[in-house]
């Protein structure tokens, strides 16, 4: 598949939306409540998905959407990395999280609370998936998607 092609961006969007779908499965079927950092990671995956979908649909503004998708991924890497660091050092987390108040005050938490409302604790122990913590999986996928978009941008610029 050619980087920067319509199919490339559609694949990135499907993966990103699929990961959000899996997060919703974990929340609504398995009963795992998302913490504020989980919700921010959902925003990043949704951003990657939406901007990749827009890049697939519009060749005239593809570069803009591609860049915004990369920025969403890089922001997601930062949030997921911070989340993993909290799990490695749970004493760094305090009981009341000001990020939760901010996330739950966003309009999206009111419009789609089943997707964007935060009720969990960032350091709560979660069952691993295939032996890996859920925040680490999020970081891994965020790196894969962001790096794929960055490499595609570099290849595009070399042409």
Swiss-Prot record:
GO terms, biological process: protein folding
> Per the record's keyword annotation, is tRNA processing included, yes or no?
no
Report the membrane topology from the UniProt record. Multi-pass membrane protein
Q: Which Gene3D superfamilies match?
A: DsbB-like
Q: What is this protein's name?
A: Disulfide bond formation protein B
Q: Does the keyword Membrane apply?
A: yes
> Where's it found, cell-wise?
Cell inner membrane
Question: Which organism was this protein described from?
Answer: Ralstonia nicotianae (strain ATCC BAA-1114 / GMI1000) (Ralstonia solanacearum)
Identify the coding gene: dsbB
Q: List the disulfide bonds.
A: 35-38, 94-122
| Entry function | Required for disulfide bond formation in some periplasmic proteins. Acts by oxidizing the DsbA protein.
| UniProtKB keywords | Cell inner membrane, Cell membrane, Chaperone, Disulfide bond, Electron transport, Membrane, Oxidoreductase, Redox-active center, Transmembrane, Transmembrane helix, Transport
**What GO cellular-component annotations does this UniProt entry give?**
plasma membrane
* GO molecular function per UniProt: electron transfer activity; protein-disulfide reductase activity
Q: Which stretches are transmembrane?
A: 9-25, 44-57, 64-81, 137-155
UniProt signal peptide: none
């Amino acid at each position: 598949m050619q980087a920067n092609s319509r199919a490339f961006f559609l694949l990135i969007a499907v993966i990103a939306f699929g990961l959000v779908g899996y997060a919703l499965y974990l929340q609504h079927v398995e009963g795992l409540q998302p913490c504020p950092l989980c919700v921010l990671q959902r925003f990043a995956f949704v951003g990657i998905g939406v901007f990749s979908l827009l890049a697939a649909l519009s060749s005239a503004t593809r570069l803009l959407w591609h860049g915004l998708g990369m920025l969403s991924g890089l922001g997601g890497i930062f949030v997921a990395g911070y989340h993993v660091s909290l799990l490695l050092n749970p004493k760094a987390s305090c009981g009341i999280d000001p990020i939760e108040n901010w996330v739950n005050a966003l309009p999206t938490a009111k419009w789609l609370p089943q997707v964007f409302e935060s009720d969990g604790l960032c350091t709560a122990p979660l069952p691993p998936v295939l032996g890996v913590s859920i925040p680490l999986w999020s970081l891994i996928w965020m790196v894969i998607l962001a790096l794929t978009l960055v490499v595609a941008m570099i290849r595009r610029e070399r042409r």
